[in-house]
Swiss-Prot record:
Annotated CDD domains: CYP58-like (cd11062)
Protein name as it appears in the record: Cytochrome P450 monooxygenase asqL
UniProt function note: Cytochrome P450 monooxygenase; part of the gene cluster that mediates the biosynthesis of the aspoquinolone mycotoxins. The role of asqL within the aspoquinolone pathway has still to be determined. The first step of the pathway is catalyzed by the nonribosomal peptide synthetase asqK that condenses anthranilic acid and O-methyl-L-tyrosine to produce 4'-methoxycyclopeptin. 4'-methoxycyclopeptin is then converted to 4'-methoxydehydrocyclopeptin by the ketoglutarate-dependent dioxygenase asqJ. AsqJ also converts its first product 4'-methoxydehydrocyclopeptin to 4'-methoxycyclopenin.
Co-factor requirement: heme
Organism listed in the record: Emericella nidulans (strain FGSC A4 / ATCC 38163 / CBS 112.46 / NRRL 194 / M139)
Chain residues that bind heme: C407
PROSITE patterns linked: CYTOCHROME_P450
EC number of this enzyme: 1.-.-.-
Pfam families named in the record: p450 (PF00067)
Pathway: Secondary metabolite biosynthesis; Alkaloid biosynthesis; Mycotoxin biosynthesis
Amino acid sequence: MSNGAPFPLDYRGTRNYGPRFIPDRYSTFVSSARKSPRTPPGGSDQVVHVNDAGVYKRTFAVASPFPKSEFFYSSVGVGDAIGAMTDTKKHRVRRSILGPRLRAKAIAPYTPSLQKLVIACMDIMAGKARQGKVINLLRYTRALTVDVISDFTFGRPMGVVNEAEEMPDLLNDLEVFGRHFHILKHFPISRKLLDIIPESFARKLMPLPGFFELREKATTAVNEAVVERQAGKTISNNTDGASFLDLLLNQIDENPSVLVDEGCAFITGGSDTTGFTMENATYLILSHPHILQSLLQELDTSPHIRDTFDLDHILRLPFLTAIIKETLRLYTPAPSPLPRTVPAEGIDVHGHFLPGGTILTHSLYLIHHNPVLFADPKSFKPERWLGTQGKVLEQYYVPFSKGSRSCIGMALAYHEVYTYLSLLFSRFEMEIFETSQSDMDWREHFFVKRNGQLRIRIVRDRWTGEAFPTRAVEADLR
């Protein structure tokens, strides 16, 4: 423990690579502790980062007495959303409303719609390839994930997949806001000011590019849904299940600002992390030819992808599953330390007593990169998840966190990633185009943002045999 350590929730520096630098500075299980400039009223003056899987299991267990820390989650810009709730009773009620809609069995009827969106993305990508253009993969993965999560949230997709622009406005707003998320995180007063001052003044006062545009789009969607509801119409346009707005309006009398918070949170969290995983998996597979060949062998021998798409079967493909797990381990989508508040009785951590009110943080990234748990943790080794060894490692596999506050959208995210990867690699022969490891390195803004972009060139359509121009030209990226 060190009182001279940098504030563990503030890793911004010149390179801003977040928790990856903690193990280099601290070799003990307690990585850092210091007086926090943002201590909650009546709380302890310590923020302690613990890099210990056993303590993590205790802190993040089901019905854990360690609640989310209000001083942090109230500042993230969507305080009324389920992911930011710090009141355990309110969270339990909200999860009981939304949780059943996001279980695997409830999602299953959506598979044909999901498959249709993925194929639409790939058809557009093939059209670009015919023109000899390079594919900016983020444009298509984020369009796909935004359309999926908006369909679940508002009852209709936002239609980003089929927009003609190289970078549609909504995707640009999400990307820009993601890169400025740290402003809300490190200056929590800015979120409170947004609630009490006119928006026109707030836009000039606070440098939050993308935030206002995102809330404006979510507000429009919520207002349209409420008007339809008042007219006696069902909000959802699809037959695969009720939208989140339907469910919330059925169960509780929520005011529009709460619904907007929930909408913004689902759109941001449900698109950014899933799209990030799709891109990382694509890069890692194409960067390791022997892994690509093993994956193609598994996909090509399956009759449940091209001919009759059977997601239940695809979810059980062992090597594809190993690739996805290893991608989520190596590139954990939410690496930022997750703060929890120590209950009143305190906790003993390996001989260190932490009093009630202490802010205790854990990083999922550090668990996934602990060399004691994962041999050669910086290497991409999907085979570690196969057989008996893989079953042993499951207890330390936490990309969506654990316990009562684990990611509510986990099953939907898996459905999207499995569908995307199985169809993409079954259909296209691809290669990485002028993308370096430096481009793939990330910066922590609670979620993660890369230094550069992943660009690929599609060489051939394996389903039709069509070969695309071998001399690719830069896409017109904005």
